[in-house]
């Protein structure tokens, strides 16, 4: 059974960045559509086109972090509750999402991701 709306396990930007930097084993899932994922996402993220694809790929005992654009985006909240309702035990939501991640100057991937290469003339 899904917990009440107010009872959501979260992860903050610093902890998520540390987990990624250390190479911790967990699944990072962007809860937006494919277009948004292709535009930009946090490195190491996964995107699933369908619920069937998602649930056949994730194991209920895996640690899963879900995110979308910001605290005001409810796609990750809905996915969080869907996973918990299906007995996924280690689920957390990164509420700050892409907006907070990008504002902190952390790396992004995708067609619209800002380039992190040093500026200067091309060789």
Regions found by a protein language model. Give the residues of each.
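Acidic/glycine-enriched edge-of-secondary-structure segments
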Residues: 33-46
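Short loop/edge segments at beta-strand edges and connector loops
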Residues: 12, 49, 95
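A generic "binding-loop/recognition-motif" signal
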Residues: 33, 51, 97
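Catalytic cysteine-centered active loop of the rhodanese-like fold, especially the PTP/DSP P-loop
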Residues: 55-102
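Glycine-rich, highly charged phosphate/nucleotide-binding loops
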Residues: 46-53
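Short active-site oxyanion
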Residues: 22-28, 43-44, 63, 89-90
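Short low-complexity, flexible loop/linker segments enriched in glycine and/or proline
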Residues: 105-109
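Flexible, polar/low-complexity N-terminal or interdomain linker segments that lie immediately upstream
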Residues: 1-36, 110-123
């Amino acid at each position: 059974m899904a917990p009440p709306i107010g009872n959501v396990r979260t992860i903050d930007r610093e902890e998520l960045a540390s987990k990624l930097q250390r190479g911790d084993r967990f699944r990072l899932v962007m809860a937006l559509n494919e277009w948004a994922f292709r535009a930009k996402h946090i490195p190491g993220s996964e995107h699933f086109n369908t619920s069937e694809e998602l649930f056949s790929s994730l194991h209920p005992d895996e640690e899963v972090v879900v995110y979308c654009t910001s605290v005001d985006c409810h796609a990750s909240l809905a996915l969080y509750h869907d996973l918990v309702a299906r007995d996924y035990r280690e689920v957390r939501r990164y509420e700050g999402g892409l907006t907070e991640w990008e504002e902190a100057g952390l790396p992004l991937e995708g067609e619209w991701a800002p380039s992190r290469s040093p500026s200067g003339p091309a060789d």
